[in-house]
Amino acid sequence: MKFFVIALIVLLGLLQYRLWSGSNSLPEYFVLQKHIAVQQEGNDKLNERNQVLKEEIIDLKSGTEAIEERARNELGMVKEGETFYRVVGGERSVSSPSQ
């Protein structure tokens, strides 16, 4: 009977060692959970970006308005017969009334 109790205590000690400091231990589990959370957050951001790009592709395929808008904004193109005006902002000086 003593041998059986000693064997159980040794077995319990080995299991506790594996639980706290061996491979696949609890601290390692928590570190992996943090890595998974960070990776999931990155995946969510990439999924949002992919969705925006998919919508932009659909918009570009469906009509000419999106293409025209990109050409105007990114390439500075104008339609035939249009006049392009560039307004350059400068600093305004506020003059106070003289007394």
Swiss-Prot record:
NADP found in the keyword field: no
Domain of life: Bacteria
Main location: membrane
A GO cellular component annotation in the UniProt record: cell division site
All ranges on the Cytoplasmic side of the membrane: 1-3
Example of a GO biological process term: FtsZ-dependent cytokinesis
InterPro entries: Cell_div_FtsB, FtsL/DivIC
Topology, Periplasmic side: 22-99
Subcellular location, record wording: Cell inner membrane
Bilayer-crossing regions: 4-21
Keyword annotations from UniProtKB, A to Z: Cell cycle, Cell division, Cell inner membrane, Cell membrane, Coiled coil, Membrane, Transmembrane, Transmembrane helix
Bilayer topology annotation: Single-pass type II membrane protein
Assembly and binders: Part of a complex composed of FtsB, FtsL and FtsQ.
UniProt function note: Essential cell division protein. May link together the upstream cell division proteins, which are predominantly cytoplasmic, with the downstream cell division proteins, which are predominantly periplasmic.
HAMAP family: FtsB (MF_00599)
The protein's name in its UniProt record: Cell division protein FtsB
Lineage, opening ranks: Bacteria, Pseudomonadati, Pseudomonadota, Gammaproteobacteria, Alteromonadales
